[in-house]
Amino acid sequence: MLELIYILPLLCFVYFLFRRFVLENFYVESSGKYVMITGCDSGFGRLLATSLLDKHVNVFAACFTQQGMASLHSEWKLKKGPKGQLYTLQLDVTSQASVDSAKSFVTKILKEQNSKLWGLVNNAGIFSIHGPDDWCSVDEYASSLNVNTLGAVRMCHAFVPLIKKSRGRIVTMGSTAGRLHGLYVAPYVTAKFAVEAYMDCLRLEMRPFGVSVHILEPGCFKTELLNNDAQRMRIQKIWNSLSVETKEEYGEDYRNDFERAWEAGVNVVANPNIGWVVDCYSHALFSWWPRLRYCPGWDAIFMFIPLSIFPTALQDWILAGLYKLNPGPSLTPAVLVKNKKRRSAIQWIQFLSQIAIIPLLYTIFFVKNTQKQTVETSTHHHNVTVSE
């Protein structure tokens, strides 16, 4: 029995190594398969589309803008040699009509090619740093949920029937923010927790149909979503929408410090190697043994994912400490700075009062002692007179 306690963990570790370094390196035939990708204007989606095309995968690349469609198509045409077929389409995942139109387009092409849809990649998403929850209206939450969560739900509802026919794959962009909370990103964290919960439920329901569902949980990567100029504009826009009371509570210095702290943090943490995320996408789509969750990024592997299993109180303590280590300026609302100064002034007054009371106490003690000595002297003289 005692031997089993040592053997079972060892066997589990050996199986983990065997699966990770042997089984996961076997791939299904990807050439000629059809994959639908959302959010191909830039970043992960665009790089994934071009990467799959180089592997002879046929790609339905959904872009939010016509400019994104045109530039991607031009890039594809300039490539020489064997490549997959590119089909570009404009898609707004927040619009059911747009999603339905995309499904009709894809269904038509598949029927013409007598083929099936192998993969759906829910890559479209938005990220915007809004600031404290006091700055966020319900609209900020609704906007984040509508793209990051409901956008994926709409796409799954539309395309899952096509994926079932091929017993294919659904891969969705989550985030470490879907596992762990943080400061100043409540709308984004809320949406990512929600979309990961949806995918976890969908994964169980799709098992009988032979469809596998996978989630990517990357750390911080340098993409257009983290563009400093765009973030400055968002911060200024939301600041302008705040009430006078809220602006006075936080102060203009806080707004400026928040902007600088955000940029400093991103420059330190963000990983420029976005190919890491694209490789995870490809593995989830075509590996014989894909993982249910992928966590690209050193910050995800060594900090955020391990931290997500800690007790909540310890998570809060560590996260608060990490934010204090931010290379940017510290963030303290104006009202707390005033209160701190007021408390400091009161403490100084109390301290000075305590110092000032010492001479007073000494004086009282001296006077009382003098009076006592005077009384004792008078009594002594009185006693001497009586004796005579």
UniProtKB/Swiss-Prot annotation:
Coiled coil: none annotated. The keyword Transmembrane applies. Pathway: Steroid hormone biosynthesis; dafachronic acid biosynthesis. Disruption phenotype: Mutants appear normal at 20 degrees Celsius but have Daf-c phenotypes (formation of dauer larvae at low population density in the presence of abundant food) at 27 degrees Celsius. It is found in: Membrane. The keyword Transmembrane applies. It is an enzyme of class 1 (oxidoreductase). Pfam families: adh_short. SUPFAM superfamilies: NAD(P)-binding Rossmann-fold domains. The chain crosses the membrane at residues 2-22, 300-320, 346-366. Its EC number is 1.1.1.-. One of its GO terms (molecular function) is oxidoreductase activity. Strongly expressed in the hypodermis and posterior pharyngeal bulb and in a number of unidentified neurons of the head and tail. InterPro entries: NAD(P)-bd_dom_sf, Sc_DH/Rdtase_CS, SDR_fam. GO terms for cellular component: membrane. PANTHER family: 3BETA-HYDROXYSTEROID DEHYDROGENASE DHS-16, SHORT-CHAIN DEHYDROGENASE/REDUCTASE FAMILY 9C. Belongs to the short-chain dehydrogenases/reductases (SDR) family. 3beta-hydroxysteroid dehydrogenase that converts 3beta-hydroxysteroids to 3-ketosteroids, an essential step in the production of dafachronic acids from cholesterol. Catalyzes the dehydrogenation of lathosterol (5alpha-cholest-7-en-3beta-ol) to lathosterone (5alpha-cholest-7-en-3-one), a step required for maximal biosynthesis of Delta(7)-dafachronic acid. Dafachronic acids act as ligands and bind directly to the nuclear hormone receptor (NHR) daf-12, suppressing dauer formation and inducing reproductive growth, they can also regulate C.elegans lifespan. This is 3beta-hydroxysteroid dehydrogenase dhs-16. It comes from Caenorhabditis elegans. The lineage of its organism: Eukaryota, Metazoa, Ecdysozoa, Nematoda, Chromadorea. The gene is dhs-16.
